[in-house]
Regions:
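Ribonuclease/tRNase effector modules and their secretory precursors
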Residues: 1-80
Length: 80
């Protein structure tokens, strides 16, 4: 599984306190039912991040078979 990082998505994906390692781990260890297709080429994964917190990651494939993360943030208890 390949990830593509650049200045834009690195800043955008980590602005809510998630690390690159945490984001990649959530995607790599996605459970049954993930990734979930959202439309417009976007996919959602939710899973355990660092310290047992739940993290939401949204990504696109760009180029094909390469994950380009566009959003990541910890989920509150009500958001799980």
């Amino acid at each position: 599984m390949r990830f593509r990082w650049n200045a834009w998505n690195l800043e955008h994906a980590t602005k809510h306190g998630c690390t690159v390692d945490e984001i990649e781990s959530v995607v790599r260890n996605a459970g049954r039912g993930y990734p979930r297709k959202l439309g417009d080429g976007k996919y959602l994964v939710e899973g355990r991040g660092t310290g047992d917190r739940f993290v939401e990651v949204i990504f696109i494939y760009s180029p094909p078979q390469t994950i380009y993360v566009i959003h990541a943030m910890p989920l509150s208890r009500s958001g799980r």
